Amino acid sequence: MKLDLDARLVGSGASVISAIEAHAAGEPLRIITGGLPELPGRTLLERRRNFARHFDCLRKALVWEPRGHHEMYGCVLVPPGDPEADLGVFFLHNEGYSTMCGHGIIALVTALVETGAIECKGQQTPVTLETPAGLIRATAHLNGQRYVDHVSFVNVPSFVYARDVRVVVPQIGEVVVDVAYGGAFYAIASVEQVGLRVLPQCVSELVEVGEEIKHAVNGKLRVEHPLEDELSFLYGTILVDLPEKLNHHSRNVCIFADAEVDRSPTGTGLSARLALLDAQGQLREEEAITVESILGAESAFRGRIVGRTKVGPFNAIVPEVSGKAFIIGRHEFILNPRDKIGRGFFMN
């Protein structure tokens, strides 16, 4: 039996939105490839504001249930405002919109090259993306020009915002955190302080503690980016643990947005951690470290410092992050105006 609903769906007033599905180190990325309205605006931030103001219903329809889930992550591709960029991109999650996304860059570049959307230019194919946090220069490292082995990208300058911030967490007591920026602001703390491990079986407790820490830091510290007001908010909490693999540096979990758990090691979070480790004198010059996610040793990103600069009054590093991603499917989502539940919901 052949099922062909296209003609009837168009006649019913339904719209179709297409997407490529990918993941980087276990964290999903839903890449919207067609069916969205044109977004006016001279800059990427203007286009994102326009989408958030007029089409946030589409974020909910594509990220929330029944098409997505609480941990779903997506992105929208737009023409770049910067002439140096191949493409503009902004990212979607359960709560709204993020400023940058490391796993998203790795997954998106993999998909762009492997689908032929970006022309392959040899074993190392450069891809430049404009994001809300700035211009990101990535490289797809190919294996025999057939598929992408891994992607590396030079992230935005990253810096430590506040050291040794003491906050009180209910049921736990005082916790010492550092706040650093790597494309977004994070509160970073050792998981040992809260009596947990970064393991899948502890995820409910990790989410609760991560949210409590973020709330406590927001109550004590005003986070302000020195150059861009739209980046001035605490995005998440990173809890750091010992690694599963001896030659890896550490394991961490990031709880971000509305209690969302990153399955990957978090590319922007790793950038923030590199800035913090450098400020603490715990990194040798040009040392590369491998950081695992809550999923274990197979879910890992590699990071190193490739430069130094200033961001306003802050000493900053220029981080490079690399990791693997895979295309896992494609979708054609049907948005029917008669389907009210299909507009998006969460059970929590």
Pin down the residues of each PLM region.
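Glycine-rich ThDP/TPP pyrophosphate-binding loop and its adjacent helix/strand module
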Residues: 183
